[in-house]
Amino acid sequence: MGRLTVLKQIAHDIACQFGPDCEVVIHDLKTKDPENSIVYIENGHVTNRGIGDGPSNAVFDVIRHNNNKTQDEPRDHAGYLMKTSDGKILKCSTSYIRDDDGSLHYVFGINYDISRLRSEEHTSELQS
């Protein structure tokens, strides 16, 4: 079973576990055009992206500045907050998957829309 097949299975399971507010996306960095790197996505409505779209600006900057000469960069980043152009608050994690030779191949991202959770928390505080 290939690496991408395994990543797709994991992505699907995570999306099923956490529901429609959880986007899970896989980028293939070996494509000719990194701005069209999405090869798999679950719940793309969270960021309004689909197959063939590109990474977020933050991930794109990391990819563009990586020279693939060190195993230490870029580093995975878990639990950071992002705000979408339409105002959603996302809690995100990004993992950089390397080939056996150490070169970047995939980016595995989890983007969880916590806007509703924050709104419900705020509402319950107001009602207290």
Residue ranges and their predicted role:
Residues 19, 30-33, 87, 100-102, ...:
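Short, solvent-exposed coil/turn segments at beta-strand boundaries
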Residues 1-32:
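Short, extreme N-terminal leader segments that mark the start of a protein/domain
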Residues 62-120:
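Sensory/regulatory domains in signal-transduction proteins
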Residues 13-17, 62, 66, 123:
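Residues that form generic nucleotide/phosphate-binding pockets
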